[in-house]
Amino acid sequence: MNVLKEVYSTIEKRIQEKPEGSYVVKITTDDKKTAVNKICEKVGEEAAEVILAAKDNNKAEIIYESADLIFHTMVLLAKSGITYEELSEEFKKRMK
């Protein structure tokens, strides 16, 4: 299984099942608007960290912060009810 798909599936499962102590549960369990706002703040924060790492030409930090950015973007997508398959289809459309 593709590692990104596996991570996305785990995020979706945690949003649904709400296991105690889960970071995903922590940032997605407020009322929908507040949760989405929190997630959006994290996406913005992580995007800024990727930019700073890139400006410093720090490959290790770019990779680390990009993983955080992709993870939080996946949380936002899953919280918004967007499936991995829908996202994949959008990428396929763009490959033409």
Curated annotation (Swiss-Prot):
Superkingdom to which the source organism belongs: Archaea
Catalyzed reaction equations: 1-(5-phospho-beta-D-ribosyl)-ATP + H2O = 1-(5-phospho-beta-D-ribosyl)-5'-AMP + diphosphate + H(+)
Pathway note: Amino-acid biosynthesis; L-histidine biosynthesis; L-histidine from 5-phospho-alpha-D-ribose 1-diphosphate: step 2/9
EC numbers for this chain: 3.6.1.31
Pfam family, one: PRA-PH
First-listed, main subcellular location of the protein, grouped into a coarse class: cytoplasm
Gene Ontology terms describing biological process: L-histidine biosynthetic process
InterPro entries for the chain: HisE, PRib-ATP_PPHydrolase-like
EC main group: hydrolase
Keyword Calcium: no
UniProt keyword list: Amino-acid biosynthesis, ATP-binding, Cytoplasm, Histidine biosynthesis, Hydrolase, Nucleotide-binding
Localization annotation: Cytoplasm
GO terms assigned for molecular function: ATP binding; phosphoribosyl-ATP diphosphatase activity
GO cellular component entries: cytoplasm
UniProt keyword Transport, yes or no: no
Record family assignment: Belongs to the PRA-PH family.
NCBIfam families noted in UniProt: histidine_hisI (TIGR03188)
Protein name: Phosphoribosyl-ATP pyrophosphatase
Gene source species: Methanococcus maripaludis (strain C5 / ATCC BAA-1333)
Gene: hisE
